[in-house]
């Protein structure tokens, strides 16, 4: 069996749960390890619940080898091109989703705008926590 080399593997890291510290920052040690991995031919990308803007801010100079999965995996965002590809859509379900969401208690509603900003339509405890981290 042929051994897989580091440059033949893409590592997908959960940014929010694995790499960030309790304060929601990317510690220098993790940043250094990611950069060392990449400098040795490792291929890396991240998954995050956060917006592309927030992920870029957290990663700083860490370069990704593939689009990041952001906004909870609903968007594949290529930072080198500054563009994203939607991985899911509510197309065709707008009426049912828009009718159902307002009646759900405790559910926050936020929209990710094309410019990367987030607009809260209805706040919840979870959404407040998430937006503070972003």
List where the protein language model places each region.
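Acidic, His- and aromatic-enriched active-site or binding-groove loops in soluble protein domains
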Residues: 126-134
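Generic detector of low-complexity/intrinsically disordered segments
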Residues: 12-17, 113-115, 133
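Active-site phosphate-binding/coordination module
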Residues: 25-127
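A general structural-boundary detector
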Residues: 4, 17-20, 42, 63
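Short loop/turn motifs at secondary-structure junctions and domain boundaries
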Residues: 2-4, 10, 59-60
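Asp-based phosphoryl-transfer active-site loop
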Residues: 7-24
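Flexible, charged surface loops at secondary-structure boundaries
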Residues: 3-6, 102-104
């Amino acid at each position: 069996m042929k051994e897989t080399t580091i440059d033949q593997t893409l590592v997908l890291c959960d940014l929010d749960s694995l790499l960030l510290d309790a304060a929601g920052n990317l510690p220098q040690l993790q940043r250094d390890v990611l950069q060392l991995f990449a400098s040795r031919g490792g291929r890396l990308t991240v998954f995050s619940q956060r917006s592309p803007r927030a992920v870029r801010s957290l990663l700083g100079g860490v370069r990704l080898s593939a689009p990041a999965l952001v906004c909870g995996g609903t968007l594949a965002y290529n930072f080198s091109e500054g563009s994203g590809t939607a991985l899911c859509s509510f197309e065709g379900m707008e009426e049912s989703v828009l009718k159902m969401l307002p009646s759900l208690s405790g559910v926050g509603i936020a929209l990710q705008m094309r410019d990367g900003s987030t607009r809260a339509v209805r706040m919840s405890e979870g959404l407040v926590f998430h937006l503070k981290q972003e």
